[in-house]
Amino acid sequence: MKLSLNETRVIGVLIEKEVTTPDQYPMSLNALTNACNQKTNREPVLNLSETEVQESLDALAKQGLVVESRVGNRIPKYKHRFCNSEFGELQFTKQELAIVCTLFLRGAQTPGELRTRTNRLCTFADVQETEKVLQGLIDHSRGSYVVKLEREPGKRESRYAHLFSGDAATTVAQIPATTNTSTPAQSNSPQNNAELLERVEMLELTVEELQNQINKLVEQLGG
């Protein structure tokens, strides 16, 4: 399996919305496109057209990873068959799937970031538990699904990336460059960084909830 950036974004959104907004799942093309292009909880932020999303859906359908669901004459909606299906090869625990989904949506991340950002999909007791699940995805019996990247200069933690887009070199090539604008004092203040990260995450979740409500209203008015 070798998925493009757009394809991992589509699958990541479908996995996310299946858990967080089950009443809006399966998803229409319009709702899926809006969710793919969210400015919160997405890295990199994309600006995909409905045509591009449809092309990704078609490519994923050929691989058996997405199916169309249509009732009567209503607009088609889509759901993933990425894993945990009856005849599928991929079988993940709730925690494993949450990590893969979040890596699809936000690129390479540290265990601490993953623990915080998966909180709507699953629960991790602490960072150590997150690291244990990541190691399980690296040592998986069917092959590695995740890779631990080399620690960046000035960073305290290594980041992890998924391998569903190819080998480590391909994965790294898709990761947006990061810059460190913090002063040394700020960098050496984990407590302040953690508090700031938590506040940002809460704001992002609030914005996402509002966007979900808007999408639901649009669906109702359009249907």
From Swiss-Prot:
Domain of life of the source: Bacteria
Name this polypeptide is given: UPF0502 protein Sde_2426
Pfam families assigned to the protein according to its UniProt record, in alphabetical order: DUF480
Organism: Saccharophagus degradans (strain 2-40 / ATCC 43961 / DSM 17024)
Similarity field: Belongs to the UPF0502 family.
Disulfide partners: none
Organism lineage: Bacteria, Pseudomonadati, Pseudomonadota, Gammaproteobacteria, Cellvibrionales
